[in-house]
Each structure stands twice: as structure tokens, then as C-alpha cells.
């Protein structure tokens, strides 16, 4: 099954999408990667969904990526004696470590590390910013606040602290257990929530031990400030606009999104734009015009993937949501201005031989009637480099490793094909042209560009570029064996 678009679609699974028929229908509607949210569901639930995805993959003979999204250190208030209280603007309100049920004057905040980092003037945002508190004075186990934006506060509502880099590890004990479980299960990507510093990613990578690629979620102001350092140690990025829009002014999120996407593209690392993309489709079969424009904007920016959360996990119309996203992507990529927008934001990087080879491959493809760029890759790195160029022709990612094929399902423009391990260059050329023909990218009369590394099966050796005819009879006998 060949996609007719470059941008990928990530669909979150949940109660509305947990059976074989629905998951298969989501894939056939356009989902390329499935997200398993570790914040919801038991390990048994997650394992059951993982098993179904792999069954769909086997039945349709197409590599499918799986992304496990770790919960992260979510901060929450305690409980109230009456379950909820109304906070009035200007009133005093205290948060502290006492486990006593809350009332209209105080509630537990069971996170001593927060109090250690707070200073007068800091803000506490409750329930996605619907309630705002200003810290007036604080100590090691309390903070006396004034209510700047009132509202109803109830049990276990989330708390954000936008003004402070909190001394919290990005991985809670639950996250560590979930990470190990997900890696043992065989997921392809791990999304790390509430990253604040590069050390958070390094810690997760040390625990994953190469079993899954690490995707850093940018959803804290501290992560935006440390973005370049975080990007360097990550395999990919998710622009998680939900908490980002709570802790920062909402009008600042679009330019931040644009900067994060461009930075990831320049680094040749996949980037997902996520959160509330088609939010109204949780209840409605048709999205708003603004939501469609939001998805389109991310595609024009050159994001590798756009993501559905509750729309596909718990909404009434999960398949329609994926189909809508697919249709928007197809429409954008057919727009005559799309190419000029993508090309204008391309970052030229010529630091290595591999950089030069993939840039030359794109230029050759655009200057001639080349039908596709095929690249052999053990790790997926060459596929990332080719995708960074955002070529005008499809990318055929050839690898003998199913794990690499699944990870590249997230990469812009990449069509993953499992091949036999190659030892000789001529065999690689023949394998590439057969893949191009068999998957509908080219006919016998056409040509493709091939990139590879010799010796084969060695990471980071991209050093050959070949223009190859798709008619095997025309492949030169003087090609190196």
C-alpha cells in the first residue's frame, strides 16, 4: 500500500480504537504510526493494542511505526472535602504538603520539590490554566497565593509552574516501569514528556539502551529555551502544544512551533506537530475551518508528521478524523505554492560527504526526469538526511532491518521497503530498481537515483550516488560488484 503524500499521520489509540477492525481501518484511512498513551490504560491494554498493530502490519505487509508516549511527572493538587470549591479573584489560597482534604482556603500540593523552587511572584496554573494563582510568600512546605483568575477547582486537577525550572526528573517511577515495559514489548519510538533539559533525554536514552528511538516533547518554556541542546541529544521532536499553550501566552505558540519545526528539519530529525489539531471531531464528523487550516499550516511548514490525540483515541469519529487529515495533506501537497514554500525553508548543510551526496541526489532528481530517490540504510540516518532535503520525488527507504523500517515510518516522504542484506553494489542497484517498479514508483523505461554506503551494513558510510535505469537489462556490466 503506497501513500500518495509525504507528510505522515500519527493516530493515538484508546477506547474508541482498540479492536482489530478499527485499527486496520485507521491504517487504511491513512495512519502511518500509532501512538500508545501510557497515561491511560493498563499494561495489558497497551500490550493488546500493540499485538493488534503488529497483526495488521503482517496482514497488510507494510511496516507500521509504534510510539509509546510516557506520562512524565504530572503535577496535581490533592482532593477536596466537597470534591470541588469555587475560587474568587482576589481571594487568598494556600497550597501545602498537608494531606488533609482541601476547602475554599487551601489544598494539598504533594510535591515538595516545587516549594523548594518557588519564589514570590511565581505563577501556579491549575486545570490547564483556567485558574491562576500568584505566589505571595512561600516556604519549604507551603505557598500562600492570591487568586488572579478564579474558577472551580476540583480533585486531582493538574498544576503547571511556567516561571520555574523545576528540580524534577523527567522520568517518574511509573515512567521508568512503563519505559522498560514498552521496550520489552518492542515499540519503535518513546516520547518523553515534560522535558526541561538535555539531561532528561540522556537519562531516557540510557534506560532504552538502543531498543527504541527517543522523541523529546517540547511543552515547557524551559525546553523552548534549551531547544538546541535538547534537539542535539534527541532522535526526534514533538511540538506538544497543549501544555505549551498553558505555560506560555497562546499567541506565542505559532512562532515557537515554526522555529521548532525548522530546527528539527535542519538537524535532519523527524518532527511531529501535535495537540488539538482536529479537536472538534471528538464530537463532530466535520472539523472546523480553523482546524483544517491548522493542519495545513503544519504541513506547509514541512513537519514530518501531524498527530491526532483524543480525536482517534476517544472520539466518536476516529476513522473520519484520520481520513480528514489525509485529505488535507493531499490537498496541500497538490497546491502549486506548496513546493516553493517548502523549498524556501530548506536549510543547506554541507558538512559531510553524506550531506553532499543527498543534496546532489535531490538536485539530480529535480533537474531530470528521475522518478524516485532510493537509499539503503541500516540505522535510518541516510533516510533522515534525504528527507531533510524535502525532494520533489518519493523516497524509497531500503533496509534489511524491520526495526529501521518501522522507525522510518515517521519520516517525511519515506516509503519503507524490507530488502535482503546486500554485500555487493550491483545487487543493491538491482534490488533498488525492483523495489521502485514493484511499489509503483517507476516503470522499466524510467530511472531512479540510488544512495548507498560501501562497505554495506556499516552505519554512517553513505558514500555512493548512482543514477540507475529501472530496466535491469540496461544496468551496466561495469558496475562494481
Language model region names:
Residues 1-481:
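Non-catalytic helical/linker scaffolds that mediate oligomerization, partner binding
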Amino acid at each position: 500500500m503506497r501513500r500518495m503524500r509525504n507528510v505522515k499521520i500519527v493516530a493515538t489509540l484508546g477506547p474508541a480504537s482498540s479492536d482489530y477492525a478499527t485499527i486496520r481501518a485507521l491504517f487504511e484511512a491513512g495512519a502511518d504510526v500509532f501512538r500508545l498513551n501510557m497515561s491511560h490504560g493498563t499494561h495489558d491494554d497497551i500490550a493488546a493494542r500493540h499485538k493488534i498493530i503488529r497483526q495488521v502490519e503482517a496482514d497488510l505487509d507494510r511496516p507500521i511505526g509504534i510510539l509509546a508516549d510516557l506520562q512524565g511527572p504530572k503535577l496535581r493538587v490533592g482532593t477536596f472535602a466537597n470534591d470541588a470549591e469555587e475560587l474568587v479573584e482576589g481571594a487568598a489560597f494556600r497550597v501545602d504538603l498537608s494531606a488533609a482534604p482541601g476547602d475554599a482556603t487551601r489544598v494539598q500540593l504533594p510535591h515538595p520539590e516545587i516549594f523548594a523552587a518557588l519564589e514570590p511572584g511565581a505563577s501556579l496554573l491549575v486545570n490547564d490554566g483556567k485558574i491562576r494563582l500568584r505566589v505571595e510568600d512561600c516556604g519549604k512546605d507551603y505557598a500562600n497565593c492570591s487568586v488572579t483568575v478564579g474558577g472551580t477547582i476540583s480533585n486531582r486537577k493538574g498544576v503547571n509552574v511556567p516561571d520555574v525550572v523545576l528540580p524534577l526528573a523527567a522520568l517518574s517511577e511509573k515512567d521508568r516501569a512503563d519505559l522498560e515495559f514498552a521496550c520489552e514489548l518492542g515499540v519503535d519510538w518513546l516520547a518523553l514528556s515534560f522535558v526541561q533539559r538535555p539531561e532528561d533525554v540522556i537519562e531516557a536514552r540510557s534506560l532504552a539502551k538502543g531498543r527504541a528511538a527517543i522523541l523529546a516533547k517540547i511543552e515547557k518554556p524551559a525546553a523552548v529555551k534549551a531547544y538546541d541542546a535538547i534537539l542535539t541529544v534527541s532522535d526526534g521532536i514533538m511540538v506538544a502544544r497543549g501544555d505549551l499553550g498553558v505555560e506560555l501566552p497562546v499567541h506565542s505558540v505559532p512562532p515557537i512551533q515554526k522555529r521548532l519545526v525548522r530546527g528539527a528539519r535542519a538537524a535532519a530529525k523527524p518532527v511531529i506537530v501535535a495537540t488539538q489539531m482536529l479537536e472538534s471531531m471528538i464530537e463532530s464528523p466535520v472539523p472546523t475551518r480553523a482546524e483544517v487550516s491548522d493542519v495545513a499550516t503544519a504541513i506547509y511548514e514541512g513537519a514530518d508528521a501531524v498527530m491526532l490525540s483524543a480525536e482517534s483515541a476517544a472520539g466518536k469519529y476516529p476513522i473520519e478524523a484520520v481520513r480528514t487529515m489525509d485529505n488535507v495533506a493531499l490537498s496541500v501537497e497538490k497546491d502549486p505554492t506548496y513546493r516553493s514554500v517548502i523549498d524556501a525553508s530548506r536549510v543547506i548543510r554541507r558538512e559531510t560527504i553524506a550531506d553532499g551526496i543527498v543534496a546532489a541526489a535531490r538536485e539530480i532528481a529535480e533537474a531530470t526526469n528521475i522518478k524516485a530517490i532510493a537509499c539503503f540504510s541500516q540505522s535510518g540516518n541516510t533516510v533522515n538526511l534525504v528527507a531533510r532535503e524535502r525532494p520533489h520525488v518519493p523516497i524509497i527507504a531500503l533496509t534489511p532491518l524491520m526495526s529501521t523500517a518501522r522507525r522510518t515510518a515517521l519520516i517525511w516522504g519515506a516509503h519503507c521497503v524490507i530488502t535482503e542484506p546486500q554485500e555487493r553494489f550491483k545487487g543493491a542497484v538491482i534490488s533498488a530498481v525492483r523495489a521502485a517498479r514493484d511499489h509503483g514508483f517507476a516503470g522499466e523505461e524510467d530511472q531512479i537515483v540510488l544512495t548507498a554506503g560501501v562497505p554495506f551494513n556499516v552505519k554512517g558510510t553513505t558514500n555512493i550516488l548512482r543514477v540507475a535505469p529501472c530496466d535491469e537489462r540496461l544496468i551496466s556490466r561495469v558496475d562494481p560488484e
